[in-house]
Amino acid sequence: MDDFQTAIYFFDAAVTEDIYYGADPVDNPKPSTHFLMLEGEANYQSAKELTKFAQTKVERALEYYTKLTSNSEILELTLDDLRKEFIYYALMATDKPGLRTLVTAFITYFIEWDFRNDHFECEVKKGTSEPFFLHLFRGCILFESLMKLNPVISPKSKTIGGILQEPKIISKLKIKSIQGKKDGFVLEDIFDKSQRYDNSIDQAIQISYMARNTLGHSLGWDANINQSQYRELYLIIGASCLHVIACLWRKT
């Protein structure tokens, strides 16, 4: 079984020790820091192939995100930007150790999809959707956490719906105010919205918000998720995470 979360837990433990003894992911990198910094091109690392694998999956998500925002005023987010503005900042923020969890969650979210996607080859069409729902929900929690803990604008609200209605936040994200639903969303709402998805960052954020408030309240939906729906939601939620980093984690 590909237990990515446990594997990265030990990578992070190594990074903790290396930084304690003087390592710096940029100025004095070590094999452990190369992985969390997604530096698959770097030499002198025993996990080079795994690092390259992780980097490739994040680059795939960046490519998707770039297509969503190519016709907007949003500044492009490159892999180097991601390393500098998010990963390096989080690794070196010793007064905010919780940010490290965002980095490891970010990496595991993007690399886990390929493993989960292979499950569909077993053709269990009416069985459990737990692996897919929990994977997507982790991405939703990451999306929410990136907004709550961003270093540029501290949100006043404690809920994702409230945050996505704060004028300063939506202005920085360059999106419209997110609308909820009085009786709450159900899984079919997400699938319907995804079918009408216009490949805009506005709708990507809306769908991610809906997924957060649906998968976060129940796993026992009668509707199963299919392979194409899983792939689409994985990319949409990932793009939403990258958008928050692009707009709310740049310090300049």
Predicted regions and their residues:
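Charge-enriched, short contiguous segments at helix-coil
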Residues: 191-252
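Extended amphipathic alpha-helical coiled-coil/heptad-repeat regions
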Residues: 1, 6-14, 26-29
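Flexible secondary-structure boundary motifs
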Residues: 147-203, 218
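Short, solvent-exposed segments of well-ordered alpha helices
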Residues: 93, 97-100, 126-137, 195-206, ...
